[in-house]
Curated annotation (Swiss-Prot):
InterPro entries xref list: CYSTM1_HM_Tolerance, CYSTM_dom
TM region positions: 24-40
Alphabetical keyword list: Cell membrane, Cell wall, Membrane, Metal-binding, Secreted, Stress response, Transmembrane, Transmembrane helix
GO MF annotations, alphabetized: metal ion binding; metal ion sequestering activity
Membrane topology, as annotated: Single-pass membrane protein
Organism: Digitaria ciliaris
Function: Confers resistance to heavy metal ions (e.g. cadmium (CdCl(2)) and copper (CuCl(2))) by chelating them at the plasma membrane of root cells, thus stopping their entry and reducing their accumulation.
Cellular location(s): Cell membrane; Secreted, Cell wall
Protein name, per record: Protein CADMIUM TOLERANCE 1
Keyword Flavoprotein: no
Entry's Gene Ontology BP terms: cellular detoxification; response to metal ion
């Protein structure tokens, strides 16, 4: 028999959505902004999360 595949990590967007559900919109937006600050660039995924985290 085959073993089950290893669990997959959450995508960045899913991680932001989880933060939004657990801690609220403000926390999710700050979390997303700090990610861009730490990697010194603004990626498209970060912008999508910032624009949509309060929806």
């Amino acid at each position: 028999m085959y073993n089950a595949p290893p669990p997959q990590d959450m995508s960045y967007y899913e991680h932001c959505q989880k933060r939004h559900e657990e801690k609220g919109c403000l926390y999710a937006c700050i979390f997303t902004a700090l990610c861009c600050f730490c990697c010194y660039e603004t990626c498209e995924c970060c912008l999508d999360c910032l624009c949509c985290c309060c929806n």
